[in-house]
Amino acid sequence: MLRISRALRGSRTVGLVRARSVLSSNSTSLRYFSRLPTCYQEKTNNSTTTIPWYLKVGDRERALKQSIFKAQEINYPSNSPDSLRHISQYLCDELGLSDIIIFDLRKGEFETAAAKISDFMVIATARSPKHCQTSFDKLNSLIKQEYESVAYVEGQFNAREEKKRQRRLARKPKLSSNSTSNVPTESWFLIDCKVDKIFVNILTENRRQEINLEELYAPEHERHKYERKESSVEGREAPQEDDILAGLRRLVNQRRQYSTVAPSVVLCRQLLANLESSDFNGAISLINNNREYSLNFMKTIHDWVSGLEIDAAKEIPWKKWVTTFESCWPLVLPEESASLYWSLRMNFFKMINIADKEHYNINQFFNDYLLAKKSLGYPITSQDLIEFFKLTIINVRGDGEKSRGYWEIVNRNALVSRALRLVEDVKDGNSIVQDGTLVSMLLRTMVSGEEEVPNHMLHATYEVIDYLVDTFGAAMDPTAIGGVLEVLAAARSWNKYMAFWEAGVGGLVPGEDHRPWSQFIKLVVDSGDSEMIRKLLSEGHLLWLKRFEVKMTDDIKEQLDRLFEKGYSQGLWFEELKEHIYV
């Protein structure tokens, strides 16, 4: 015991000696530290502490996590359904989600697709990606049990997929070395509950801070509460900092800002502003610098032209607009959207022709659309021909007295012949002749002027009609029959009109007469030709309605009533015929 006590007294003596030596040596260090710049000293007595930015990174990250979403009671919108309250309380009480906010989207204009199809947008914070996944699984189970529905989720990345990803990276060392798989995945689950148009967003805290969905869905008068504000103190650089450290500071401070407006929308607005201010050079320059948005630019120009009034359209410099539109056309059309490009092109040039025929005629449309499409290796379809024939008819009937000469319509029809030659299988004639709408429109291009007065008709029209009768007879398409009747009625060729109508009668059987009877009677009544009306009533043509057991539709009855009224006004009485047909 004496030896132990002596040893302890000796160790205490040695400890005191060593402590004195350490204090004496540290006095030099303290004197040296006092000579350092003041930015590295901690001041007291009503002074602040100045610390370099690279020592405050951890504090900054902790500050970012202090959001405005404090623990609070859930505020429900007025007149909200019970399902919303049930789901929200389940998220809070059972799943442990925090900072739950509900936005009422029933009123207001929102640009996002989710906002347009939802009434309530719920946003909640989870503690981890695993918490997000578990919360979705349990919420989906609740929806199945309580509401007999299945939720739809976007952004799901479960543990099984994470394990597959890890195994794939393990097999490829290069990918694994460059991967940030050791960093926890930041999750965002967007869930359509399929109940009362309720959508739920479950996000991790950092992800919620980064995306800031609240600013997107908040009402206009509350949006300022959720705007992201960057600290101005942290963004201030000290003049004595090294350039490398300043670059690192900017790298740490940067945060990606998400925009809810697509770049194409901004560029299209700028394009429209240039065109409305007649800055065509600026518009073409904008298009050339953003070739990837060519389809969006074409839609913008097309929609603007379609919204013009007829009176204002005549004052538009169409040549410059056409040049701007052509500059949108890509050198190589993408196959997946080629049909959209051609559809926009056809409609755009059609609108220009209708708006200003003097400066953009039908020949220019033929070159800019049909010939251009054929030269680029795309086939001319039946719909292309139908639209071209319609436009030709509009141009012919809109030119007044100029279009009523026989040789004028011959010249017009030469362009129609050129269009037909562009069809690859035109030699067979099957694709054209068997299309009733196409035949009808083709025949209408062979008649000039308005339908209310006698018009010129090409001699070749009769040859085409005879060919149709010989080829198809009673099996001719009803639409084609209607087209032939309109052409013959417009030319007042009534003998040919009646001969064509009865040409295929021999091949008909009761119950199989599908000819357009209402159109046949209507054209005669609209013509006002008293001789033709008397002939139709007195020569027994209407008796075929009973012989072939034609179904008496409302349209046929309406036209028959008009026909008999015309006969009464001319002193013709056919009460027995009327009763026989209507019975």
UniProtKB/Swiss-Prot annotation:
GO biological process: one example: mRNA stabilization
UniProt key word Magnesium: no
UniProt keyword Mitochondrion, yes or no: yes
Feature: compositional bias, Basic residues: 165-174
Subcellular location: Mitochondrion inner membrane
Chain segments carrying region Disordered: 163-183
GO CC annotations on file: mitochondrial inner membrane
Key words of the record: Membrane, Mitochondrion, Mitochondrion inner membrane, Transit peptide
Membrane topology summary: Peripheral membrane protein
SUPFAM superfamilies from the UniProt entry: Nucleotidyltransferase (SSF81301)
Transit peptide range per the UniProt entry: 1-29
Annotated InterPro entries: Atp25, ATP25_mRNA_stabil_dom, NT_sf
Biological role stated in the UniProt entry: Probable mitochondrial mRNA stabilization factor.
Record family assignment: Belongs to the ATP25 family.
Name of the molecule in the record: ATPase synthesis protein 25, mitochondrial
Organism classification: Eukaryota, Fungi, Dikarya, Ascomycota, Saccharomycotina
